[in-house]
Amino acid sequence: MTARAVTATTAIVDEGDPHRWMIALAATLASLMQVIDTSIVNVAIPHMMGELGASIDEIAWVSTGYILASVIVIPMTAWLSGYFGRKKYFTASILIFTVASFFCGASSSLPMLILWRIVQGIGGGALLATSQAVIFEAFPKREVGTAMAVFGLGVMVGPTIGPT
């Protein structure tokens, strides 16, 4: 390979994905959705207690189940995204999180709500880490800092626009 070919190849790689800002927006919105969900559940716990007739000890499993599932998935995220492919794993995580969110809202009993919160935690646990990896891959090195700052801003805004 000649020096000119190496330079041309490097220039192509350094440009990043042509749709990189759309990718960053999608990754930020997915992470924002996960962050807002946490504040929504915390605010809704007293209402869920009344609606489902649950004690504080029972309703705590709504948050605990999500957290446990998330904590289990987070360390496996790098391996899973490498095995399935980062884009597929990221898309599957969004899909699992969103479908589980729907079923959480449709749950009519505490055990069903806890089950769907665990499933939601499986999808949500991967969202923040995988979002950052997707953004990092989509941008050239010179723009990664800016993209991560925009991503971080989006994630930090989540709790402020969510219910309090």
List each model region and its residues.
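Transmembrane-helix bundle of Major Facilitator Superfamily
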Residues: 2-164
